[in-house]
Curated annotation (Swiss-Prot):
The gene is sucC. HAMAP family: Succ_CoA_beta. This is Succinate--CoA ligase [ADP-forming] subunit beta. It comes from Halalkalibacterium halodurans (strain ATCC BAA-125 / DSM 18197 / FERM 7344 / JCM 9153 / C-125). Heterotetramer of two alpha and two beta subunits. The keyword Ligase applies. Residues 9-244 form the ATP-grasp domain.
Length: 386
């Protein structure tokens, strides 16, 4: 789950991580009032959307008086920002962060991620702040320093100090930087983050170390124990189809293709998308119905897939282990009748009760194309949607 920058900074502040003073605004008048309350000579007006690259897209403006705050707020609110992370459709700005300006001396990068290679949380830091860390990794990887964190003892002070010295934090500010990193790590662990990025971390003219931007993502599987984080959820920033899918414990991610996929198991779902691509098709979604799908779940899955107008055909690829193929067949039949399916449907079943499942599909009298294998199914659906 993603949250907005201002929410991330609010959370960081609770853990003693230094951030600039700021206020959220949902209207132009609120933005001006927020700037008045901050009382800063310079304010930054920042669009709040779940995507990076806002500055380049015109979503971050520096205002030197209240008139400029009003002008920029009016300009940004309601605007659709298109960045490298939003896709061509962009995201509409519905809220702003009005933040006090600061005298930036130097920009750095600090981030925490899960490293699959070591199965550990890793803190990364670089003195190349303010730019995409992926770009730094590609062009100058020697400028990125890492500390692998032992989960038993957590991030240690000496590790934070080593990072601070490696990225050339001024010696007199190393203590602040260490406190910052330790606080950030505490947030990451205690709040079940999957990513915590501060880009840029800055040193200021008045001798402070603070987060100028904050990106915190959270493990959705841990939200049951993170009620406070769940309250930060902004449904306006999420795909309506993904929201609907979550109500039925379906894992759904929208893609750009025209072949709807309904599969059980994340691995099989990814393999299904791969094989569709292999046969020159384009998947319209990732949809994992899970191991305990019912006829109701399958019906809802069909409805969600069909709510995407770009879908021209559906490929159902099920391996019945925990889930029985006859139950899936019943769900497919029920869903096909209920939604009045008018586009091609290819079904591949394998596993528990597969013969019974295939028999039910054959006897349904519906226009369902059976597939003998995953490759056969992919070829059939690709040819049917052309």
């Amino acid at each position: 789950m993603n949250i907005h920058e201002y929410q991330g900074k609010e959370l960081l502040r609770q853990y003693g991580v230094a951030v600039p003073n700021g206020k959220v605004a949902f209207s132009v008048d609120e933005a001006v009032e927020a700037a008045k309350e901050l009382g800063s000579n310079v304010c930054v007006v920042k669009a709040q959307i779940h995507a990076g690259g806002r500055g380049k897209a015109g979503g971050v403006k520096v205002a030197k008086n209240l008139d400029e705050v009003r002008t920029y707020a009016d300009e940004i609110l309601g605007k659709t920002l298109v960045t490298h992370q939003t896709g061509p459709e962009g995201k509409e700005v519905k809220r702003l962060l009005i933040e006090e300006g600061c005298d930036i001396q130097k920009e750095y990068y600090v981030g925490l991620v899960l490293d699959r290679a070591t199965s550990r949380v890793v803190m990364m830091a670089s003195e190349e702040g303010g730019t995409e860390i992926e770009e730094v990794a590609e062009k100058t990887p020697e400028k990125i320093f890492k500390e692998i964190i032992d989960p038993v003892v957590g991030l240690q002070g000496f590790q934070a100090r080593r990072l601070a010295f490696n990225i050339n934090i001024p010696k007199e500010l190393v203590g602040q930087a260490v406190k910052f990193m330790l606080g950030l790590y505490k947030v990451f662990v205690e709040k079940d983050c999957s990513i915590a990025e501060i880009n840029p971390l800055v040193t200021t003219g008045d001798g402070k170390v603070m987060a100028l931007d904050a990106k915190l993502n959270f493990d959705s599987n841990a939200l049951y124990r993170q009620k406070a984080i769940l309250e930060f959820r902004d449904l306006d920033e999420e795909d309506p189809k993904e929201i609907e899918a979550s109500k039925y414990d379906l894992s759904y991610i929208s893609l750009d293709g025209n072949i709807g996929c309904m599969v059980n198991g994340a691995g099989l779902a990814m393999a299904t998308m791969d094989i569709i691509k292999h046969y020159n098709g384009e998947p319209a979604n990732f949809l994992d119905v899970g191991g305990g799908a019912t006829a109701e779940k399958v019906t809802e899955a069909f409805k969600i897939i069909l709510s995407d107008e770009s879908v021209k055909g559906i490929f159902v690829n099920i391996f019945g282990g925990i889930m029985k193929c006859d139950v899936i067949a019943e769900g497919v039949i029920q869903a096909t009748k209920e939604v009045g399916l008018s586009i091609p449907l290819v079904v591949r079943l394998e596993g528990t009760n597969v013969d019974l499942g295939k028999k039910k599909l054959e006897e349904s009298g519906l226009n369902i194309t059976a597939a003998d294998s995953m490759a056969d199914g992919a070829q059939k659906i690709v040819s049917l949607v052309k």
